[in-house]
Amino acid sequence: MSDYKSTLNLPETEFPMRGNLANREPEMLKSWNEKGLYQQIRESRKDSKPFILHDGPPYANGDIHIGHSVNKILKDIIIKSKTMSGFDAPYIPGWDCHGLPIELKVEQKVGKPGHKVTASEFRQKCREYAAKQVDGQRDDFIRLGVFADWQNPYLTMDYNTEANIVRSLSKVIDSGHLHKGVKPVHWCTDCGSALAEAEVEYEDKMSPAIDVAFTAVDKPALLAKFGLTEYAHPISMVIWTTTPWTLPANRALSVAGQLEYTLVEMVKDGQTQALVLAQELVESCVERFGAETHKVLANVLGSELELLRFNHPFYDFDVPVILGEHVTVESGTGVVHTAPGHGQDDFVVGQKYGLEVANPVGDNGVYKADTEIFAGQHVFKANKAVVALLEEKGALLNHVAINHSYPHCWRHKTPIIFRATPQWFISMDQKGLRTQALSEIEKTQWIPDWGQSRIEKMVENRPDWCISRQRTWGVPITLFVHRETEELHPDSVSLMERVANRIEQEGIQAWWDLDAAELLGDEAEQYRKVTDTLDVWYDSGSTFSSVVASRPEFNGHEVDLYLEGSDQHRGWFMSSLMISTAMNGKAPYKQVLTHGFTVDGKGRKMSKSVGNVIAPQHVTNKLGADILRLWVAATDYSGEMTVSDEILKRSADAYRRIRNTARFLLANINGFNPETDMVAVEDMVALDRWVVRRAAALQQELLEAYDQYNFHLVTQKLMQFCSVELGSFYLDIIKDRQYTAKDDSNARRSCQSALYLISEAMVRWIAPVLSFTADEIWKLLPGERGEFVFTETWYEGLQSVTLDSDLSDEFWEQLLTVRAEVNKVIENARREKQIGGSLEAEIMLFADEALSTALSTLGDELRFVLLTSKTDVVALSEAPADAIETELASLKLGLKKSEAEKCERCWHHREEVGQVAEHPTLCTRCVTNIEGEGETRQFA
């Protein structure tokens, strides 16, 4: 054989079998950065049609987690695929930099503002901390192979962005959407200040649990709802609460509209009365109340009770029944005492019904001087007094002490309260914001489409948006309020622009340093500066204006796509929609895509305590970013995204299949010059024409899947092509022709031309997903080309190929099926040691007339398709009794070991081996390929 080895066209490539991605990728990143790849891409798409994906900013605190990776990789795949489609798709990454988590981190280091450090110094420390966090996260995102303008990201703490956030608020105000109101917040009476969620800890606490009766104002109206006409005894609706001190602020009774409520008669201590209770809780309630006897009088849906009125148990006013989604039957009575000034759920439902937000409690936890009966008492100490008064009024049905989980201040470890405080709101209804936002939702494409109904329900039900916070590190609400009337300064909008100009130069500290007289002159004494800061959701929600509208890369274009996790319907998608609609009367986006959360192999959330966290840094350091990227692309993001070491291992296996396909392609176009060696499609061998046609059809499917953001379909179709059409069929068949044909023959160049065309197309197909691997392949492809695949567009060399009428797509599909059946028979023969390899086999195909006609089309070249040394097509009717059945009714098979000599060069067993005296170990085909014109192939 050694004599003939040099006559073979053996595959050769510098593209290694092993990706070694973890080591090789950082080198590529360095090269991309040094060569300004992102700017090269921008330059290549200058003046092209824009596609704007606006980056929802992650919070600048802590390391990135797997969810961050999913998000950034999905965005990157879209940006790259849109770029390949010819769009100018800049990507400006952003970070959310203000807010409580950063304050808490800085507090741990330097203490609270106003103690060891001034508020100004504290803000500077927050700015420095956020900048450091951004640097760490940026490095991790870059490592994922995400292309972006990493040197010029947007930060919500950039001076110009802070200024633009203020300008955005001025437009919202100018449009008439701002109003001042009150809202309950966590309040520590020891701190004398509001607490954020992160500052609240839950500890066990003993509290009084009481059942309280509210008597009916209009008995006949209530009875009518239950289908009754008269009843001689008192009727009450009963609430259960563990915070008796909030009863002075009661303004309603909440029931669940969809629950059944029962009017139950109870006799206790000789007294008869009827009570309204949730049907499911009647038995537990009457037992708790110590009833001697009870009977059900009637039932009705909670929704029927809406707006009936009941008397407050100790004040001289009555309150309505309202419907609340927060009402459950887990405990209590199924009726919830509602004090909008002392609870978030109460406040939200109270907003819907326009209830007064009563706040009888001062900063120090003591009832204010105008609080009837309880003025001057501390709320927790007043519990006993409230209970005693209820008993005196005959309204107390039960009283016990319970131990339950209760919010405490994380600093003082003392119980806290919910307390209404003055806040700034964007109104949902005073200028029609809710109606307009719902209209805009309909005009937006939501992917998946259930996102539309989800955000619609949220907008329909959401209360006014409280945009103010009492924090130090945040964009200030730059308003001047009249000291007596609490009215905004009449020139607020123009004053805000002047403040914004200062912030643009000096950052948000400019507001706190500002002397009101500098802007207001003599009016300064009549006005006070607002010291509240904006909710950080306002910061990020206004970036369509504060960032997109001001960055030159976006050139004034509107945003095409927002893409975030499914929690952002309530978060960034919502805040952006509200602000944009309030400012401009329209949504800030045309499409909104959401992806699910990452969960482990058992469907559990990632949690350090469970120990199931998969850090993206660990994956890139061990397997490489391309493996992580392939997992993201291959996973259907519309639901939960499952990830585990086992799943990533499967991604690595899939990656190897793609890599091995690419390696085969590169190895077999080694030495091929597309300028001089390309065979025109019409002159190609039929099988080569077919595979180019399949690649062209696949490209259409892939481009459609990319365009519709169906990346899991991209990977599925690509894997199918690599594994089935190429791996199991085409590449297997062409090895003989590729290796043994005369090196410059049409038979071989036809094959190489097809491989080259597929390579040019495939490197582009995979570039948005397997970016590192695509770059590696690109550099090894023959022919003149640009430096990077990422500046290219989809390959246009896969022109439509017309197949011979006899050799249609259906013909080749049929051949694939026949070959699969033949392979089963050959594999079985190998297992039973009947033959060594497929080339030792001679195959008889007993086929019906239609199949026989099709197979005979290929003549002697059928053996190359079936990878056997000899094939005979025989009529099905002549099949012997021992012929092997197949899955096809039209085909039976026979196999025997060839008795012919084996050709030393091509390994086929042929009768003509040794017919040429000078080459006694070769078949005549190999002799022709070595010394003659070279064999002619027409079909395969």
Swiss-Prot record:
InterPro entries in alphabetical order: aa-tRNA-synth_I_CS (IPR001412), aa-tRNA-synth_Ia (IPR002300), Anticodon_Ile_BEm (IPR033708), Ile-tRNA-ligase (IPR002301), Ile-tRNA-ligase_type1 (IPR023585), Ile-tRNA_ligase (IPR050081), M/V/L/I-tRNA-synth_anticd-bd (IPR013155), Rossmann-like_a/b/a_fold (IPR014729)
Catalytic activity as recorded in UniProt: tRNA(Ile) + L-isoleucine + ATP = L-isoleucyl-tRNA(Ile) + AMP + diphosphate
Highest taxon of the lineage: Bacteria
Chain location of the short sequence motif 'HIGH' region per the record: 58-68
Compartment annotation: Cytoplasm
EC number, UniProt record: 6.1.1.5
Keywords, comma-separated and alphabetical: Aminoacyl-tRNA synthetase, ATP-binding, Cytoplasm, Ligase, Metal-binding, Nucleotide-binding, Protein biosynthesis, Zinc
Cofactor, free-text remark: Binds 1 zinc ion per subunit.
UniProt: Zn(2+) binding residues: 903, 906, 923, 926
Co-factor(s): Zn(2+)
Motif 'KMSKS' region location, chain numbering: 605-609
Kinase listed as a keyword: no
PROSITE patterns: AA_TRNA_LIGASE_I (PS00178)
Enzyme class: ligase
Molecular-function GO term, any one: aminoacyl-tRNA deacylase activity
Gene Ontology CC entries for this record: cytosol
Pfam families: Anticodon_1 (PF08264), tRNA-synt_1 (PF00133), zf-FPG_IleRS (PF06827)
Binding site for L-isoleucyl-5'-AMP: 564
Residues reported in the UniProt entry to bind ATP: 608
PANTHER family recorded: ISOLEUCINE--TRNA LIGASE, MITOCHONDRIAL, SOLEUCYL-TRNA SYNTHETASE
Entries under HAMAP family matching the protein: Ile_tRNA_synth_type1
Record remark on domains: IleRS has two distinct active sites: one for aminoacylation and one for editing. The misactivated valine is translocated from the active site to the editing site, which sterically excludes the correctly activated isoleucine. The single editing site contains two valyl binding pockets, one specific for each substrate (Val-AMP or Val-tRNA(Ile)).
Physiological role: Catalyzes the attachment of isoleucine to tRNA(Ile). As IleRS can inadvertently accommodate and process structurally similar amino acids such as valine, to avoid such errors it has two additional distinct tRNA(Ile)-dependent editing activities. One activity is designated as 'pretransfer' editing and involves the hydrolysis of activated Val-AMP. The other activity is designated 'posttransfer' editing and involves deacylation of mischarged Val-tRNA(Ile).
Similarity section: Belongs to the class-I aminoacyl-tRNA synthetase family. IleS type 1 subfamily.
Subunit structure, as described in the record: Monomer.
Name of the protein this chain belongs to: Isoleucine--tRNA ligase
Lineage, broadest ranks: Bacteria, Pseudomonadati, Pseudomonadota, Gammaproteobacteria, Alteromonadales
